[in-house]
């Protein structure tokens, strides 16, 4: 493969792959079992995949081997014989330094699978996969300030990560007679990942390191919450919370992990090994056919997933939002001084409540769900088909603030009903 994003001499790289399979059911010794297991194949593959899709959104430039200099973007100075004749000059600024010794990012991919057919009705597929990714482009974190790079910290290929999991699917088709038949299908995927090598600062506390933990989006970091403050006296006798607003009764109380008497970002830690990206995804559906009629349903869902709602729910004013009734009814107040209230106190400005919007166990929610995705009834005739379809019919989830499959700012999925005709000529 070749790319223009890399310097000459590193633009082309070879990425080999190999695969092998054995159809065991084709062997003579399998003949006694063929009426039960009519097909069995064991397969495996290993290969290297390259990518030049460095993290553009994260700050890398398209041509990573060039410095980025902005004329007139730096500091300024006055020159001239007198104040009335001075001339203001602005120098250039370095917004990004070239990354040296840059290559393709690589993923070494291993897959081992089995394909199985039982009684000429049931098809089963299983895959185990493991990916090892290296040369990940990351902004250097362990970079001494004495080097003087200011706001243009270099990027380098210093990251390594691992992704591992398995996929399973099963499909069953059965013709009971000329009139009746059934198709049943299901799938299940589990995946997990972690940083193998991550450029990090020399943190003071061990819980601040991310190496060995799931990657961003697959975990949640935040503060550990001990409840809500009940009184000014409790606030005075607790660690000082330096999170933007002065704590008041009804505000969230955080745990001082390092014991220094202050709540700062040094007290943030891993609060869930699951993030908004699910580890588990699954789906199941069935189609029944009777003569010219067919009826199909499909469900999908995900698990091992959490949602952080702290700053997203934002019921705290100064954003032109209406206050939801369920928040008002379940908030901490003088009339409801419950240290385990579902929502902290309300206020008249967002700046007065920034203490309560930090990522924490208080705002962590279980994001698993099951969705009734589709229901379709159809009638087939000689030249086509008539059908009625419903999509996104229901969702079951412990998370009830918005659609658990979406972000809070995403346009919601619509429940739709369709009446259609398909014609064949």
Spans of model-derived segments:
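Conserved small-residue
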Residues: 57-66, 175-276, 336
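Short glycine/proline-rich turn/loop motifs
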Residues: 91-94, 262-267, 352-360
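Conserved active-site-proximal loop/helix segments of enzymes involved in bacterial cell-wall
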Residues: 139-142, 263-265, 313
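C-terminal extracellular loops and terminal segments
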Residues: 152-162, 204-220, 271-283, 315-329
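Extracellular/periplasmic, surface-exposed regions of secreted and cell-surface proteins
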Residues: 1-217, 362-425
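Extracytoplasmic gating/loop element in the C-terminal half of outer-membrane beta-barrel translocons
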Residues: 3, 247-249, 302-385, 390
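Glycine-rich, aromatic-lined ligand/substrate-binding cores of catalytic
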Residues: 273-308
């Amino acid at each position: 493969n070749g790319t223009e994003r890399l310097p000459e001499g590193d633009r082309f790289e070879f990425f080999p792959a190999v695969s092998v399979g054995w159809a065991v059911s084709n062997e003579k010794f399998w003949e006694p079992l063929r009426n039960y297991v009519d097909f069995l194949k064991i397969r495996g593959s290993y290969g290297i995949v390259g990518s030049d899709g460095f993290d553009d959104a994260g700050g890398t430039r398209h041509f990573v081997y060039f410095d980025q200099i902005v004329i007139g973007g730096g500091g300024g100075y006055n020159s001239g014989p007198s104040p009335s004749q001075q001339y203001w000059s602005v120098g250039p600024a370095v917004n990004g330094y070239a990354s040296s010794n840059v290559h393709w990012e690589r993923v070494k991919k291993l897959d081992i699978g089995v394909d199985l057919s039982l009684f000429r009705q049931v098809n089963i597929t299983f895959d185990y996969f493991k990916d090892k990714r290296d040369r990940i482009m990351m902004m250097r974190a362990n970079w001494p300030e004495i080097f003087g790079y200011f706001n243009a910290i270099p990027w380098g290929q210093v990251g390594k990560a691992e992704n591992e999991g398995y996929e399973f699917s099963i499909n069953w088709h059965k013709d009971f007679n000329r009139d009746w038949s059934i198709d049943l299908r299901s799938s299940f995927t589990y995946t997990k990942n972690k940083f193998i090598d991550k450029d990090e600062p020399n943190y003071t506390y061990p819980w601040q390191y991310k190496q060995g933990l799931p990657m961003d989006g697959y975990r949640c970091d935040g503060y550990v919450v001990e409840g809500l403050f009940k009184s000014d006296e409790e606030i005075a006798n607790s660690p000082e919370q330096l999170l933007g607003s002065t704590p008041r009764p009804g505000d969230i109380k955080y745990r001082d992990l390092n014991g220094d008497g202050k709540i700062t970002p040094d007290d943030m830690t891993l609060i869930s090994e699951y993030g908004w990206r699910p580890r588990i995804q699954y789906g199941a559906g069935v189609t029944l056919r009777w003569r010219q009629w067919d009826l199909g349903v499909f469900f999908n869902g995900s698990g091992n997933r959490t949602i952080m709602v702290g700053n997203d729910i934002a019921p705290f004013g100064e954003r032109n939002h209406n206050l939801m009734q369920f928040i008002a009814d379940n908030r901490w107040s003088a009339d409801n001084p419950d240290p385990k209230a579902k929502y902290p106190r309300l206020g008249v400005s967002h700046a007065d409540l920034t203490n309560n919007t930090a990522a924490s166990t208080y705002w962590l929610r279980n994001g698993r769900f099951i969705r009734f995705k589709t229901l379709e009834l159809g009638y087939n005739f000689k030249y086509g088909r008539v059908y009625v379809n419903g999509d996104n019919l229901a969702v079951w989830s412990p998370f009830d603030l918005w659609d658990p499959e979406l972000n809070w700012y995403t346009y919601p999925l619509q429940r739709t009903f369709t009446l259609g005709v398909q014609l064949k000529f």
